[in-house]
Every structure is written in structure tokens, then in C-alpha cells.
Amino acid sequence: MAVLTPAEVRDVNVRYHDGAAAGYDAKWSIDFDPLARAQIRRKLESALGEPPPRFEHALELGAGTGYVSLNLMLEGLVTRTTASDISAGMLDALARNAERLELDVQTLVADAEELPLPDASFDLVIGHAILHHLPDPARALAECHRVLRPGGTVVFAGEPSRIGDRLAAFPKRAARASAPLWRRAIGAGPDDNRSPASGHDLEGLVDIRVFGAAELAALARAAGFDDVAVRGRELLANWFGWYSRGLECSAAPAQIPWAWRRFAARGYLALAQLDQRLFEGRLPADLFYNLSVCGRRP
């Protein structure tokens, strides 16, 4: 990973996510249908280790286009949401999604390490795949503690584990090797039209860290949280996901058949459910690609 200053990390994240916003939902198969809502419910339940309660007011950090916060509202788990992101482009996409879904969401362009929000304002602070983008995750967790009401819950999910990230290199390499044959099989050409405005050239710079389970737990405790728990999620699903995503990223997006995208999405979800039944809670958290951490403000 390239070594960047904190200011450079923030600048790269803004430019990458602003550029990627328009095609982000299509690239990552983000949806707001019943299947997606159930998936987000499972992610939250997995992170908490129990069925989630209903939260009155939630803050999402790194909200992106609304995959987590909007699905939580649609699922009836959150009443009010403030969606925060450093990227105005992502929040514009989120606002369009919210309008289409007839959801009322407040958006806020802000740095997760310095939130322009009053103390003790939220019942839930949640983030998905954001801590590994931040120059100072400890500072962000301290801000989460500050803006949570006493008894409030913090949840971060989708953070890459050190071991899981190494294991993911194998399906990524396999995808690169087999991509030409796969493209011929589905009748798609290579993706030769990635413009600099899309932010694709910056994608390798925005992921600046991986975590160990003990490290994540220590960060949350140091921020002042009680009842801290770190859990691992997705083993087989992760390997399948990185392989299928690697194939898709090699092809012109408009030429990838809908049937393939549906197969990839359903395959990922089926393996995620298998992981949940067979492996999660039984194997060490560090073996999984995705780590979650949760805690409670005293």
C-alpha cells in the first residue's frame, strides 16, 4: 500500500468516491429490494451477536449511496437517519436513492474524524467498510463515542482482516488469469473505457489498512466503549465474491449479461448463509475477510 499523509488520504478518498458515485450501485450490485434488506439485517445481527432492536436515530459514517442506512430504514430497524460521508458525490447518489424510495434522510458532508455534530445525539452510530479508509480510526471511534447517547450502540462492519486480506489474493489472481476465457464465454469485451473521472485509477490508494480482531477490540475499548465484541463474517462467500468481482471488473460493464450478475449475487448470498451456519462463531474471527466490531457507550 502507498504511504500517504492524512491530508492526501482524505483528498484521494474524496476524488475516488466522487468519481465512482454515478456507477457505484451497479458496480457493487447495491439494491434496496427485500433480499438486500434481509442481508443488511443479517449483517447487523451478526455484528451484534443478537437480533437487533429498533433504533430511533442513527448516524451512518461513510454512508456512500445508502446501502446500509436506507435498507435499515426500509427494514424498520431505524426511524431517523443522518447519513454522513466525506464525498458529496456519494451523498448526492444517496439522496436520489432516498427520494426514489420515499425516505426522508438528512445528509451531511463531513470527516468521520471531526464530526460537526453535538454530543449525545444518536442511539446508533454505524459504518460499513469505512475504518480501513481513515487516517486515524481511533479518532473516529472517539467521535462516535462523543455523539452517542449513554447506552447507545456503535457498529462497524465490513473491515478487512489481515489474514483474510492475504487469503483473498488467491481468488483475485485466479480471476485475472481466467478473465479472458470468461469474457469470451459470456460474449463481453474488455473494459478499455475507464476514464480518469471515474476514479478507477485511485481505487488502489483508498484502502490504507487492514485489522486484526484484537486490534479492533482495543481501538473500541480505548475510545471508551463497553461490551466490545469483534466477530468475523464471510469465508467462502468472500472467496467467491472476489473471484466473481475480479471477472466483472475486467469486462465492459454494459456487456455483462444480467443473468451472470444475478448468478453472482445469488451465489454470494447462498455462500454467506452457508458461512453463517457452518463457520461464523466457530472459527477464529481473524480467518474471515470481514471483521465487525460493536460496543456500547456507558
Give the location of each predicted region:
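Acceptor-substrate binding/catalytic loop of class I
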Residues: G199-E215
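A C-terminal cap/extension of S-adenosyl-L-methionine-dependent methyltransferases
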Residues: A217-A218, V228-P298
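Conserved class I S-adenosyl-L-methionine
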Residues: M1-P52, V68-N71, T153-A188
